[in-house]
Amino acid sequence: MSLQLLKALPHLRSATTAVRTQIARTTWSEHIATKVFFSTTTTKPTPSAPPPPPPTQPQQPAATTSWGTKKQNRKVKLRSAAAEFIMSNPEIEAQLAPLRERVQEQGNLVRDLKAKGAPEIDVKKAVAELKARKKLLEDKELALTPSVVSFDRAKMEDLLKRRFFYDQSFAIYGGITGQYDFGPMGCALKSNILALWRQYFALEEQMLEVDCSILTPEPVLKASGHVERFADLMVKDVKTGECFRLDHLIKQALEKLSKAKDATPALQAECEDIIIKLDGLNKQELAGVLAKYNIKSPLTGNDLTEPIEFNLMFATQIGPTGLVKGFLRPETAQGIFVNFKRLLEFNQGKLPFAVAQIGNSFRNEISPRSGLIRVREFTMAEIEHFCDPVLKDHPKFGNIKSEKLTLYSACNQMDGKSAAQVQIGEAVASKLVANETLGYYMARIQQFLLAIGIKPECLRFRQHMSNEMAHYACDCWDAEILTSYGWVECVGCADRSAYDLGQHTAATGVRLVAEKRLPAPKTVEVSEIVPNKQALGKTFKKEAKNITDALAKLSLEEITKVEEQLAGDGQYKLTTADGQSHDLGKDTISVKHSTKTVHVEEFIPSVVEPSFGIGRIMYSLLEHSFQCRDGDEQRCYFTLPPLVAPIKCSILPLSNNTDFQPYTQKLSSALTKAELSHKVDDSSGSIGRRYARTDEIAIPYGITVDFDTLKEPHTVTLRDRNTMKQVRVGLEEVVGVVKDLSTARTTWESVTEQYPLFEQQEASK
């Protein structure tokens, strides 16, 4: 190799790195990567060869991960996130509407000129004008859209992996799709988010906290409806057997179709309308969309099977006999419902009260993707608020009724309108939000998400349409956060009515009810089945107990039916819990009517349930806090708020001078006593490089021990991660300052007003 070439190599490497960085970066002008689809480069076919299938998403081997470092040899197709943000903001949409009309008008003109075979010069002039109008629209979008939505996802994922926030589980064995391990930073971040969640909800609302079993017997989930209804629609490649979740497949195909060069405005509008309403379509309607647009396998171009239902629960066997079937819980809520009676007793029979639970749940996703967004094992933080079904007021609603939320109602979704900012008090008064308790939790959810660092302009509450409502809900709002993947459902807030407690009462015969005292005693008629135990035992032997238990569970309507049948043909057919039927006559049972005076009334409580997906919240927060230094795109960091930052403070001796060690050790001990997580970085690297390393793991503050620290009075510098500014603080004061900053009792702006800004050391040794 020549000397000239050897000298040129460093410059070539730098140039190559710069080009790769530029390619990987995504800005509004280059269309932000809301969804990333990978496709191998295709070669131009020979004239005799059949045309290739449209570009599709190739199958990724299970051994690969989705991290940015694996993407260097793939062609990345980018889709803009601007549209999704703008659609949620009516003020921005109003400003852009005239520009959109001008672009659409010019686009139609270009199509007409081409269709009529107009002179080439006329077409070129029209195209030039179209480009100018599109540029004007894009510039306006860029000016109006927050920078938080625009970022380099591949660069962020590289940083997350390199600093081990989280990584794919069992990576050395090839990894498992949809499963992730949290490293030291990810684990600390998750713990801090959950600690703040407990403070905001469990502590503030004086909730009862439980920790229930993950293994759930089948009868529990049969009663709740999960065995029958907890399924997604799936289609298969008829040749390879590859499985695809149907709604995701349709969305991907229609997005691609609407962005094709020959897509008409009518087709684009049709595709957008279907995508918006996709979650509300049933099996037959989704199959119709599949057939209408002739959607094929995205991996092979092969035909797909008819949609089939796939239950998302992980089945297992409890015990060695294999006779007890169970599931890994799909949600934590059922453990709370089956313990309702004990919890009500613990609360001295009083309503309302709320129960909190944090734990892992499991769903056997058909096609897990998008990192922490869609996984098979995930942490949930759920609340079950039990209240009187006819009195769903909340005592603290007055504290939050003026809170403004961005609400995307079901009506606005159906009419193609944007979300709107509404005071939660007005939303409840107008019945847009069903009741005060639901509205209270929605406002508290917003306060919590903003406190951990979610950007307010990227948060909205979307109401479920009636045909997409969960089987247990009578009203439901999802807190959705805008990320590079689009709007992601992170918190569900549902009014589950009395469904769950009613189902478990019917299945077990255990009355999961509450009581309330009546204003005045009242006389009521009572009907009950009176079994002739002697006759039952003689006739049915060992089955007599099952029959007696089944009779005790009959409702008032069923008792009336028993009486009618006994009066008719003298027989009543009873089905017991084991599925067997028994004919009972007047000699074995009778119906007794009586009256009694009651002072209390029984009722099945309603439940309002906020359910937090911690992994999704974490990922959204990491995106919103990811930044690169101005003028140095290689220096990336996370602006996580001190409240949730994994490590609150770093201690950085200026050099490895042994005189610094006593001060470093003293600071470390003081921070530990103050219960502040911290990291000592006394490595030999330059102080600037060490600052950059601590910024990468989101440490908000750094204490530097320098030569001025050795002088009386002993002082240190305190550095802020976001601004990189430093102040000079007394050695004995600095831990208290960091404590106040980390618990949000003070701000960095207040600290800079109280202490002098640090410019340079006075002493050098």
From Swiss-Prot:
Residues 41-73 are annotated as: Disordered. Its EC number is 6.1.1.14, 2.7.7.-. GO terms for cellular component: axon; cytoplasm; mitochondrion. ATP binds at residues 363-365, 374-375, 489-490, 616. Residues 47-58 have a biased composition (Pro residues). One of its GO terms (molecular function) is transferase activity. PROSITE patterns: AA_TRNA_LIGASE_II, WHEP_TRS_1, WHEP_TRS_2. InterPro entries: aa-tRNA-synt_IIb, aa-tRNA-synth_II, aa-tRNA-synth_II/BPL/LPL, Anticodon-bd, Anticodon-bd_dom_sf, Gly-tRNA_synthase/POLG2, GlyRS-like_core, tRNA-synt_gly. CDD domains: GlyRS-like_core, GlyRS_anticodon, GlyRS_RNA. Keywords: Aminoacyl-tRNA synthetase, ATP-binding, Cell projection, Cytoplasm, Ligase, Mitochondrion, Nucleotide-binding, Protein biosynthesis, Transferase, Transit peptide. Homodimer. Belongs to the class-II aminoacyl-tRNA synthetase family. Catalyzes the ATP-dependent ligation of glycine to the 3'-end of its cognate tRNA, via the formation of an aminoacyl-adenylate intermediate (Gly-AMP). Also produces diadenosine tetraphosphate (Ap4A), a universal pleiotropic signaling molecule needed for cell regulation pathways, by direct condensation of 2 ATPs. Thereby, may play a special role in Ap4A homeostasis. Required for terminal arborization of both dendrites and axons during development. This is Glycine--tRNA ligase. It comes from Drosophila melanogaster. The gene is GlyRS.
